[in-house]
């Protein structure tokens, strides 16, 4: 959704974009299967929402990693065609990664191969996200912009959420 905001330092309006999306941890502080149970519930509700003609959700961005599609479809393979249709119709964005990387643990080649694998899976579903979606690492490696550009991505979502910081002047 596109929103206009006033900018007190300029006559031109600021334009902000709101993209419904999710960040999904496959395993963090709970075992994988507990997260998968939550994933199944989430995706079931998401598919129903995106298929509902009366829904206000024009589209949804699914986390940037394709491995969650595999996790879901291992349990509910009958929904593959529903997901493919939503991807092809531009209602569900998938990829470009196979799994969201921790950039400081792996090297540049691993990042490229991760993207290549994610591209292949995304395209099997009918398309891929054209944004370098990496919102949750503990920083970004210096070569990431070149890697993203090298695979044809010119936009980068580098963090999620916005803090409530207020300067001394208020």
Residue ranges of model-derived segments:
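Catalytic-domain carbohydrate-binding cleft regions of carbohydrate-active enzymes
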Residues: 1-170
